[in-house]
């Protein structure tokens, strides 16, 4: 299943995996998953985190390695994101709830994820998604950015 991904997709997933894998040991633990989810404003219980890891953890060692992560991500790409999941993701970025993601909000979320971006990189990300040129990303532009990836 993972072999249907492009090299670019695999590279993006590797980058995402490394955001979760805080200690760089090649495995995501429930603690690391919890840290990332809390940085995104979620508050999962220990049991919920364990369920998430167990769902992906094919070899039963209690952690998620990159091949397991890749399998999960390729499966998730097949089940196109539900409207509610996309709305929820948009709300994570739209901190002030005004219906737009500004450069400052994007930088804030990416920093909380451990991604230090320069102003230029943040501006490039906004420009790539900002089809009407108003300097911020509205919900429609956000959806378009997700589905055109």
Swiss-Prot record:
CDD domains named among the record's database cross-references: EFh (cd00051)
Gene3D superfamilies cross-referenced by the UniProt entry: EF-hand (1.10.238.10)
Top-level lineage group: Eukaryota
GO CC annotation: centrosome; cytoplasm; distal axon; myelin sheath
InterPro entries listed in its UniProt record: CALM/Myosin/TropC-like, EF-hand-dom_pair, EF_Hand_1_Ca_BS, EF_hand_dom
Residues bound to Ca(2+) 2: 57, 59, 61, 63, 68
Sites where the protein binds Ca(2+) 1: 21, 23, 25, 27, 32
Keyword Repeat: yes
Binding residue positions for Ca(2+) 4: 130, 132, 134, 136, 141
GO aspect biological process, one term: establishment of localization in cell
Other noteworthy facts: Binds four calcium ions.
Family: Belongs to the calmodulin family.
Known role: May function as a specific light chain of unconventional myosin-10 (MYO10), also enhances MYO10 translation, possibly by acting as a chaperone for the emerging MYO10 heavy chain protein. May compete with calmodulin by binding, with different affinities, to cellular substrates.
Subunit record text: Interacts with MYO10, the interaction is calcium-dependent and essential for MYO10 function in filopodial extension.
Name of the molecule in the record: Calmodulin-like protein 3
Organism: Rattus norvegicus
């Amino acid at each position: 299943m993972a072999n249907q991904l492009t090299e670019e997709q695999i590279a993006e997933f590797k980058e995402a995996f490394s955001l979760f894998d805080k200690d760089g040991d090649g495995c995501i633990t429930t603690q690391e998953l919890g840290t990332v989810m809390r940085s995104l404003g979620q508050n999962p219980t220990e049991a919920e985190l364990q369920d998430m890891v167990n769902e992906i953890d094919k070899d039963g060692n209690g952690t998620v390695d990159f091949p397991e992560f890749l399998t999960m991500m390729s499966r998730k790409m097949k089940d196109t994101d539900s409207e509610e999941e996309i709305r929820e993701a948009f709300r994570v970025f739209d901190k002030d709830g005004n219906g737009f993601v500004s450069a400052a909000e994007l930088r804030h979320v990416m920093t909380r994820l451990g991604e230090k971006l320069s102003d230029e990189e943040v501006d490039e990300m906004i420009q790539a998604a900002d089809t009407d040129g108003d300097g911020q990303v509205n919900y429609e532009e956000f959806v378009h950015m997700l589905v055109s990836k």
